[in-house]
Amino acid sequence: MTLSFEILEKDIAGRIGKLSGQGKIVKTPTLLPVINPHLNLIPPKEMQEMGVEAVITNAYIFSRSEEYRERALTDGLAKTLDFDGVIMTDSGSFQLSVYGEVEITNAQTIAFQQAIKSDIIVPLDIPTHPDSPREQVEQELSVTMDRIMEAKDIADHEHHTLAGPVQGGLFPDLREETGRRLSEAGFRFCPIGAVVPLMESYRYAELVKVVMAAKRGLSPAVCVHLFGAGHPSMFALAVAMGCDLFDSAAYALYAKDGRYMTTHGSYHLNELSYLPCPCPVCVGHTAKELNESPDRERLLAMHNLRVSLAEINRVRQAIRDGVLWELVDERCRSHPALLRGYRTLLGYNEELTALDRETKRRFFYRGDESCKRTEVVRYHQMVGRLTAGERTLISFSRHIKKKQTEEYDSVFYFKPPFGPFPAELTETFPIGQSEIPDFDEEMIKTGCIGIARLMETNPDSHFTIRCRPVWKDLITQILPTVEVQDEGS
């Protein structure tokens, strides 16, 4: 089965999409819970009742299992797992990253994954550790690409979707080039691999650089899977970068360790006096009861998975409403490392602007980071297309008397962080749908970028800015050729 990927809605680089084939449909973005047949805390059938549309399991574990190997070969994964959604299999690369070797070849794992009727199959790529030196990364990437192309030659593309993993360590040029080669080779499902160590050590800024480099090389039509991303606190950030699917065993691993997941971090269950969640597990138990329950691990896994699935829906709604930046901002303020990742992503705002939608439901100013959002970048690009008269007034106040404007050929108002706008744009996005608090220095500086752009494209105009006295020195410093007057003069 070759899955097709259709993009339905977008915000920033995030997409709501649909993976479909042979009657199976997966809405994206989505989470693929990891299924270990030997440690089945939540049966896949029960997951499906919770809204899970796709899962991932490890083909290498099945191939080595006396209990499950023959069942999977005889009945197929869908019957063995009792799950009729999309099933993806990992080749054994996870074991390769943990143990350094696996007793299976690339051709063997492709053949086995097809034999057990996996929907999405993965070649035996080498998940090079992010801190590996470039020479090692290049050598292992070369082996990975050879294996991917070997898999492409031998795979049954009519009945299976072959994934093309994007490796390349921390080197953006290698990630980008790999993504480009995979897209040119026709791959339409590409996981970004070997990033779990970055997430485990909270290196989100580096994660952003890796993902953005890979995305730069990949075709926009490619469905992008972020291997091993399983904590709900970072789903919004990952989706904003353009990741469509995630997989993780975190829901179960955290439960085994007694950790309780939330969208802003995790708690050890024995530290909680109250359960801040309305899921059935939390409504039906106090923190003490849950901690002392003989079924604690399973119940905690149920909670963790429900929290993760709810966050996926929250991200989808944010995309639909055009407010994904605000959800990213909210989530990334839960930890300094996530905030670093958020700020790093904003450094790609020019690239993201080209992918973002043009109009949105609203713009809420939430701090300095809002000044670098794509809506602001796009407005600064647009403002250069406006025409200014020979004598132009830019007023920081909307309340000016007609006699104060009579000597000017054109009048613009000022709304930071966007900048100058004519009265005709008052009700249009983003001017009319943006909410900002009292002016602050950073938003004024950013708004002045818009003024500078208007001046640049209207070189014959003489500009006068009227503002409160508190801003005069700052504006004179940023725009030294502009005449600055006090409001009311």
From Swiss-Prot:
Query: Which residues does the Swiss-Prot or TrEMBL record annotate as the active site?
Result: 90
Q: In which pathway does it act?
A: tRNA modification; archaeosine-tRNA biosynthesis
Kindly list the GO molecular function terms attached to this UniProt entry.
Answer: pentosyltransferase activity; zinc ion binding
Alphabetized, the UniProt keywords read:
Glycosyltransferase, Metal-binding, Transferase, tRNA processing, Zinc
Would you kindly state one Gene Ontology biological process term found in this protein's UniProt entry?
tRNA wobble guanine modification
Per UniProt, substrate binds at 125, 194
The protein's matches in Pfam families, at most eight in alphabetical order, are given as: TGT (PF01702)
Q: What class of enzyme is it?
A: transferase
User: What Enzyme Commission number does this protein have?
Assistant: 2.4.2.48
The record's Gene3D superfamilies line, in alphabetical order, gives: Queuine tRNA-ribosyltransferase-like
Q: Name one GO cellular component term.
A: cytoplasm
Cofactor(s) demanded: Zn(2+)
Q: How is the cofactor bound?
A: Binds 1 zinc ion per subunit.
Binding, Zn(2+): 277, 279, 282
Catalytic function, reaction form: guanosine(15) in tRNA + 7-cyano-7-deazaguanine = 7-cyano-7-carbaguanosine(15) in tRNA + guanine
Top-rank lineage group of the source organism: Archaea
Please list the disulfide bridges: none
Functional summary from the UniProt entry:
Exchanges the guanine residue with 7-cyano-7-deazaguanine (preQ0) at position 15 in the dihydrouridine loop (D-loop) of archaeal tRNAs.
Q: Which family does it belong to?
A: Belongs to the archaeosine tRNA-ribosyltransferase family.
Provide the protein name: tRNA-guanine(15) transglycosylase
Species this protein is from: Methanospirillum hungatei JF-1 (strain ATCC 27890 / DSM 864 / NBRC 100397 / JF-1)
